[in-house]
């Protein structure tokens, strides 16, 4: 009997020891699971933050305008040069003698012309290049609504250099009318405008509204303009660049009716014509 009691006692003691071991291991496993759960929460929070950040982005955040760069070894990429228009152009919105708009088409790669650079990533950007060089408009440009320009109606991005606008530009019921561009959020340089302009608000000799306008010349007549009217630009972006432009107008100032030395400076038509780079057509 005593031997049986001793055997049961040993069995119970061993069972108790085993239970203690299992309990310790269970505590360790639970602690490990809790640590894993905490890390999962951290990862989920990071993913949620990344998703929220992407949701807060506009489409423009995915595009970088590289039109003012050298073309990354591809000088003809995104380039229009030495085009001329002598015909009348009519349209509703985004009307121009050479191009209606310089902008990004948001439909996903309709022509299979995207080039991928780098490894796969959720944080991606598109590089956009749109350059217009030495183009001339002589035709009459007529729009019904916003963004009517002698050379291009709307520049969401891009660069226009050495272009000339001679044909009359008008919008019957719209804003943003310009001898070169109706509105430009890109770069306009070394361009010339000698034409008649008519619109509602934001009417300018070079651009109705501009971001960067440099070393450009205008000798224009404005038949109609209500607010923000200038011989170079009707108005500019707050942090825009306006420099080296010349205005051949007796009474109208360069920017919203006011001239600025070194930026939108008044001069005479004879002085404009005497400039070494003045196009022959401009001086006639």
Model-derived features: positions:
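Predominantly extracellular beta-rich ligand-binding scaffolds that present long acidic/polar faces
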Residues: 1-284
């Amino acid at each position: 009997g005593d031997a049986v009691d001793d055997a049961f006692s040993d069995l119970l003691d061993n069972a108790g020891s085993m239970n203690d071991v299992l309990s310790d291991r269970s505590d360790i496993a639970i602690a490990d699971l809790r640590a894993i759960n905490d890390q999962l929460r951290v990862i989920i929070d990071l993913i949620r933050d990344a998703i929220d950040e992407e949701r807060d982005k506009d489409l423009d955040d995915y595009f970088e305008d590289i039109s003012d760069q050298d073309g990354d070894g591809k000088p003809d990429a995104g380039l229009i040069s030495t085009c001329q228009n002598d015909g009348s152009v009519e349209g509703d919105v985004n009307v121009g003698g050479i191009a209606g708009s310089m902008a990004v088409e948001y439909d996903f790669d309709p022509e299979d012309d995207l080039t991928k650079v780098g490894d796969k990533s959720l944080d991606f950007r598109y590089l956009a290049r749109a350059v217009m060089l030495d183009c001339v408009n002589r035709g009459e440009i007529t729009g019904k609504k916003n963004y009517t320009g002698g050379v291009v109606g709307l520049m969401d991005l891009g660069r226009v250099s050495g272009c000339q606008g001679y044909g009359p530009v008008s919008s019957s019921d719209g804003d943003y009318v310009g001898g070169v561009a109706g509105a430009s959020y890109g770069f306009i340089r070394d361009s010339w405008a000698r034409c008649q302009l008519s619109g509602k608000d934001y009417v300018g000799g070079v651009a109705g509204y501009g971001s960067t306008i440099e070393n450009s010349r205008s000798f224009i007549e404005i038949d109609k303009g209500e607010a923000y009217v200038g011989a170079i630009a009707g108005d500019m972006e707050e942090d825009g660049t306006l420099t080296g432009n010349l205005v051949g107008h007796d009474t109208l100032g360069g920017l919203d009716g006011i001239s600025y030395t070194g930026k939108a400076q008044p001069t005479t038509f004879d002085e404009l014509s005497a400039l070494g780079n003045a196009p022959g057509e401009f001086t006639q």
